[in-house]
Amino acid sequence: MVADEEVRVRAEAWNNAFGYIKPTAVATAVELGLPDILENHDGPMSLLELSAATDCPAEPLHRLMRFLVFHGIFKKTAKPPLSNEAVYYARTALSRLFTRDELGDFMLLQTGPLSQHPAGLTASSLRTGKPQFIRSVNGEDSWTDPVNGYHMKVFSDAMAAHARETTAAIVRYCPAAFEGIGTVVDVGGRHGVALEKLVAAFPWVRGISFDLPEIVAKAPPRPGIEFVGGSFFESVPKGDLVLLMWILHDWSDESCIEIMKKCKEAIPTSGKVMIVDAIVDEDGEGDDFAGARLSLDLIMMAVLARGKERTYREWEYLLREAGFTKFVVKNINTVEFVIEAYP
């Protein structure tokens, strides 16, 4: 028994040593278009078919697919009648989530040069509070550089993928939150992807996407949505519901309180602020997303020294300091929770 445990622990150590390979392999599959190809194909595909569809040689593609099948991203299936090829591959429920309509673009951001988290999470960064990867990759603050087209497109596409995923969960699990709401202001709403889904689901809602002027200036027109430029440290457009989706985890407690106060000023006494962010449970027993939330917290520490994921008690403190009298937490069965805060 002791020997078996020693083997298990040693295997776990090796798996941790090579742990970065799995997300890299998934991102490579996304870049090749494999999840979309198999999702849109009528039935399984052979290695040669996938090779032709991706313009990738069969031998390295076989090795990539072997790894991804082992980890449950794709699956092998029986060959069709009259086929000369031994192995066929099929999509899975997991691979569907890595299509470009789902989280594929978000995966590319997390593994690309714009988000070199492993390089940022170092002993030095913990001791000094200064993320190392920012200087090593581009020498500038992560919000201002890189500004070249490719990296910013990767970032924008990833944020849009996250907005689609999370907004779908909000629509599914919190429809009552939008009853009687006339105007929703999405603070940090970028190009209005989240608002577009909300307006489609709740057609009585008018949307305002509020972000930096240089961001909203590039937003495409969307029915039912107005784009307003500005800074949430100065003021927030008036609305019945102010949405803060994945915004506050970027900021220190002091900045969060300041932002939340501005949002509170923008709503009537009958309004609310909807915060969509992770709530960290340090035990996390029985919670499928607990590990992802803890990982996200380390990512924030690596990328932004001021950023963090917060516990229930930490959120309670921020809301109280910002002047909210009560709040309700709702589980939407994803990495984030919905916190409805009332003045």
From Swiss-Prot:
Subunit structure: Homodimer.
Top-level class of the enzyme under EC nomenclature: transferase
Protein family: Belongs to the class I-like SAM-binding methyltransferase superfamily. Cation-independent O-methyltransferase family.
Pathway in which this enzyme or protein is active: Flavonoid metabolism
GO biological process, one term: methylation
Name listed for the protein in its UniProt record: Flavonoid 4'-O-methyltransferase 4
E.C. number: 2.1.1.-, 2.1.1.75, 2.1.1.155
UniProt superkingdom: Eukaryota
TM ranges: none
Chain residues that bind S-adenosyl-L-methionine: 211
Function comment: Flavonoid 4'-O-methyltransferase involved in the biosynthesis of polymethoxylated flavonoids natural products such as pebrellin, aroma compounds which contribute to the flavor of peppermint, and exhibit pharmacological activities such as anti-allergic, anti-oxidant, antibacterial, anti-proliferative, and anti-inflammatory effects.
Keywords per UniProt: Methyltransferase, S-adenosyl-L-methionine, Transferase
Name of the coding gene: OMT4
GO molecular function: O-methyltransferase activity; protein dimerization activity
Reactions mediated catalytically: apigenin + S-adenosyl-L-methionine = acacetin + S-adenosyl-L-homocysteine + H(+); kaempferol + S-adenosyl-L-methionine = kaempferide + S-adenosyl-L-homocysteine + H(+); isorhamnetin + S-adenosyl-L-methionine = 3',4'-O-dimethylquercetin + S-adenosyl-L-homocysteine + 2 H(+); scutellarein + S-adenosyl-L-methionine = scutellarein 4'-methyl ether + S-adenosyl-L-homocysteine + H(+)
Phylogenetic lineage: Eukaryota, Viridiplantae, Streptophyta, Embryophyta, Tracheophyta
Originating species: Mentha piperita (Peppermint)
Catalytic machinery residues: 249 (proton acceptor)
SUPFAM superfamilies associated with the record: S-adenosyl-L-methionine-dependent methyltransferases (SSF53335), Winged helix' DNA-binding domain (SSF46785)
Pfam family, one: Dimerisation
